[in-house]
């Protein structure tokens, strides 16, 4: 029987690329996001390859998250694979100059949103004693960099939650892992720098990871045999050696 995957943050970047990659392999999709117009365009494109259902909600809204997932039609109710991808970064400021609104946005989406969606899906996985959860973290969850403070904190939390999930869900045979990319050329920087011109320079002078690169790794992780769980992946583009070392001559 073909599996069904629920992907948050599916309207752009890694989430969108993962939906496309999964569709190529015939995995049924529940694509989630805040931008209904984009969800509908993606659904129209991908339903030529597989079955696609859209859920339009904001992971920061606890009630809306549970209501949306509870509304899934019978054909999509059984979620075999959960990709917790929704996340963002706002600002790059020293802690003493940071915006409270930026901090709230990062913690609400990157941490609490991941928890809300997971809480809504995990009970069915424990009941079936099967399932696979992939949390999309970041190299920022492995290494703190200057002015990264709260964003790095949120991504360290994602990795801690992932490890805790893996321990707690091990008795049920549920796989849990994290994929942690470094610099990926997506809308990420435009959101972080609020459309500032700085965002346009982030990916200049080198070849950053593309969303499709990360999506291929995610598919590799979820397509391993039942006895194999890839618990943690850190991936960089060749030009990047760490959060602070980038060779723009490559």
Which functions belong to the PLM regions below?
Residues 25-42:
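Conserved glycine-rich Rossmann-like NAD(P)H-binding loop of the short-chain dehydrogenase/reductase
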Residues 178-179, 197-244:
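C-terminal helical subdomain
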